[in-house]
Amino acid sequence: MKGVQTLKTKREFDYVYKRGIAFHSPYFVLFYIPDKDMRIGFVASKKVGKAVQRNRAKRVLKALFIQYFDQLPIGRYVFVAKPKLLGADFKRIDQEMTKILERIKRRKW
């Protein structure tokens, strides 16, 4: 995962939200913009739960990102957790990520 930077400021996140393409799944939303460098952000709002649940949701999303890092095109990503994420097993979340990855690859940029 060398060369990956995190999105830090509200301005950086807002840029990806407004200009990026949203890929929805029952467990998370992935915003993506093609870019020259790899930048990533993870978000879990209070709708997901209290701090412990939000942190767990972000860890699950980060594990997905690490697992698929080599297959993802370079760009800016924001993973937004949905409340259903914590109730699902990792295998189902993994299947959804595979579907989204295929949609990203099929899209013409």
UniProtKB/Swiss-Prot annotation:
Q: What is its EC number?
A: 3.1.26.5
* A UniProt-annotated Pfam family: Ribonuclease_P
Q: Provide the transmembrane region boundaries.
A: none
State the superkingdom.
Answer: Bacteria
Q: Which PROSITE patterns match?
A: RIBONUCLEASE_P
The UniProt function text for this chain reads: RNaseP catalyzes the removal of the 5'-leader sequence from pre-tRNA to produce the mature 5'-terminus. It can also cleave other RNA substrates such as 4.5S RNA. The protein component plays an auxiliary but essential role in vivo by binding to the 5'-leader sequence and broadening the substrate specificity of the ribozyme.
Q: How does it assemble?
A: Consists of a catalytic RNA component (M1 or rnpB) and a protein subunit.
Q: Which family does it belong to?
A: Belongs to the RnpA family.
User: What protein does this entry describe?
Assistant: Ribonuclease P protein component
Q: Which organism is it from?
A: Nitratiruptor sp. (strain SB155-2)
The beginning of the lineage is: Bacteria, Pseudomonadati, Campylobacterota, Epsilonproteobacteria, Nautiliales
